[in-house]
Curated annotation (Swiss-Prot):
This is Thymidylate kinase. It comes from Thermosipho africanus (strain TCF52B). It is an enzyme of class 2 (transferase). It comes from the Bacteria. The keyword Transferase applies. InterPro entries: P-loop_NTPase (IPR027417), Thymidylate_kin-like_dom (IPR039430), Thymidylate_kinase (IPR018094). Transmembrane segments: none annotated. Its EC number is 2.7.4.9. GO terms for molecular function: ATP binding; dTMP kinase activity. Keywords: ATP-binding, Kinase, Nucleotide biosynthesis, Nucleotide-binding, Transferase. Phosphorylation of dTMP to form dTDP in both de novo and salvage pathways of dTTP synthesis.
Amino acid sequence: MFIAFEGIDGSGKSTQLNLLSQYLKSKGKKVLNIREPGGTILGEKIREILLDNNLNINKRSELLLFLASRAQLVEEVIKPHLKRGFFVLADRFSDSSIAYQGGARNIGVETVSTLNDFATDNIYPDIVFYIDIPTKIAMERLKDKNLDRLEKEGQIFLEKVRNTYLKLSKLRDNFFIIDGTKSIDNVFAEIKSIVEKHLQS
């Protein structure tokens, strides 16, 4: 099973991914945690470029770098592990590009979706958890952090990202909005319940 965690910066998605990973392992499942961009030697080098505060990256270049990292991750890591029966848990996947570059960068949701399909060889998560928080809360959570290039974009940018994610939720049955303002335990309880239902179906 392939599960992706999405959300604006500061949403707590990485925490929830780790909790689900620990839970599945406790049930005897084989689990692989991955992150985007990254997860491969090439992907980690691309990650360094994308998050470098000293670089001025054109929005189309930014998108193509994300797609290159994703394409490598799918072929080198995701496909082989799914074939071996692993639960693959992704800290961001294709919907991040749709929200950040397609929506917030105004490249266009349809354009990015088409390019995503090519980059991923039409691989899409079985479940997407979007951890939703207001942008004001996100900015509060990020204020004491050493911010990377994308995290420095500010609240207006994050608002565009969030709005695009919320639109995506209306288009897909396997895209679940989780209220990230609840306690960590309550958020995880909701995620665990959804995963267990999918495992039983």
